[in-house]
């Protein structure tokens, strides 16, 4: 789904301000602002609201693994900026468990990203 195709609809988006800013950027090229009907903290609440016709929810794709209802449609947003960025944060002075060290190594390897230390 292209962001411009969402303009006629009421949208339900995550409550975090950073997510609203990201979603607003998807619509910059359209010359129009989306109609944000609600900002919902929990994606399952947004799912229920969408199920009952309140609006279209914009949430991480991971919610699709939780949905078993045939009355709900899940589509990917087709925009280069339609992705979430995350950071791993840990205390440098704290000794991490073996599992934590392995997880960090895995993330570094899979992402190809450099780890930055503050």
Enumerate the predicted regions with their spans.
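Secondary-structure junction motif
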Residues: 9-30, 96-100, 104, 114-118
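Beta-alpha-beta core module
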Residues: 5, 44-93, 102
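C-terminal alpha-helix
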Residues: 106-110
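Short beta-strand-to-loop elements that line the ligand-binding cleft
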Residues: 13, 32-45
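Short helix-capping segments at alpha-helix termini
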Residues: 31-32, 67
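Active-site-adjacent beta-strand anchor residues
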Residues: 13-16, 39, 57, 89
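Short coil/turn segments
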Residues: 1, 10-20, 62-64, 79-80, ...
């Amino acid at each position: 789904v292209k962001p411009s195709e969402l303009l006629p609809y009421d949208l339900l988006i995550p409550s975090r301000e950073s997510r609203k800013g990201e979603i607003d950027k998807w619509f910059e090229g359209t010359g129009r602002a989306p109609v944000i009907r609600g900002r919902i903290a929990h994606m399952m609440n947004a799912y229920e609201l969408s199920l009952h016709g309140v609006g279209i929810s914009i949430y991480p794709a991971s919610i699709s693994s939780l949905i078993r209802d045939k009355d709900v449609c899940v589509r990917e947003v087709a925009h280069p900026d339609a992705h979430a960025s995350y950071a791993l944060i840990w205390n440098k002075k704290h000794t991490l468990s073996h599992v934590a060290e392995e997880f960090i190594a895995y993330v570094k390897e899979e992402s190809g990203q450099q780890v930055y230390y503050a």
